[in-house]
Amino acid sequence: EILRAKFPYIYVDEYQDTNPIQTFILERIREKETIVGVIGDRAQSIYSFQGAMPTLFDSFHVDANCEFTIEENHRSTKKIISLLNAVRSDIMQKGVDSTIEGENIVLVIGDRNDAFRMAYDCCGGVLQSLSRDNTTANALKKDFEETSMNTKLLNKFEESDSDDYRRQRIWSFIQAVELSFNNNYKEALKKIEWIFSNENNSRKAAIASLSKLLLYYKDFCNKMLIDFYHTICSITGLKLTGFREGNAKKFYDSTPYKSLAICVDIVDDTSSHITIHKAKGAEYDNVIVFNDELKSFLLSPNLQTNEEHRIIYVALSRARKRLFLYLED
């Protein structure tokens, strides 16, 4: 009743991203007095992990004379709009008077890093890569070889090192270092400040330890995880458990620091390599898309029931001028 009295009109953008609880609240509010208007695109519903479902968007009923379809695409070239129309049948988008024909969409096949560099050169050094997962995005940042990438490495880390005290601190320091190199110092300190909770000034201790680690970055970034472990023990003075023969020692001896570093989730990522989910709502002049499901999407697109295909659609629709699609083979 209070919300109805305060807000006679409510407008909800990106309605396809609402979860069942949010939908329930809005439905209750609109039962009387308050007029609720929503805008969204079921083809861009990509947050099932938060409870969002295309069916929730479909279930928002309005009178026929209150439902409108926006067909004009003010962002992309005619070539990109043609691709967007080819993969969906529910609406037919069209450009506006200022829409240009644009360049052909390019399929790039082969090595992932070579593909990015080729597209980068074609665009004069202005290119945004959009990847399905954090690991791929971070690997591209570091020009990391695709054959060395393991998206399940964090799970293996937890399985191999059963010492929670040691493993949690090692991982926290890795996150802090990588966040720092993305200029997110506030979040970086949050990751390790808890480790120094017994200190008189935990924040000061965290800053001191992180500063030293960053100075020694070149000494461990291209080495194994065991070298990072020794660096932490030496610089911070933390008493971390040593290693006996077994799975933990084998993992630390054989896993490069960079392999774990690329698994760090950079929340406020403003780099040229981000995930598709982080690009939602944004737009870029030139885009290259990395997604393992891209081939199946191009051959048989299914935006109705396949969320992976909707994720790819979101990526394609971010591009203004040039679009590159990467296929491994």
What are these regions (language model features)?
Residues 1-329:
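The feature marks helicase ATPase cores and/or their adjacent C-terminal helical subdomains
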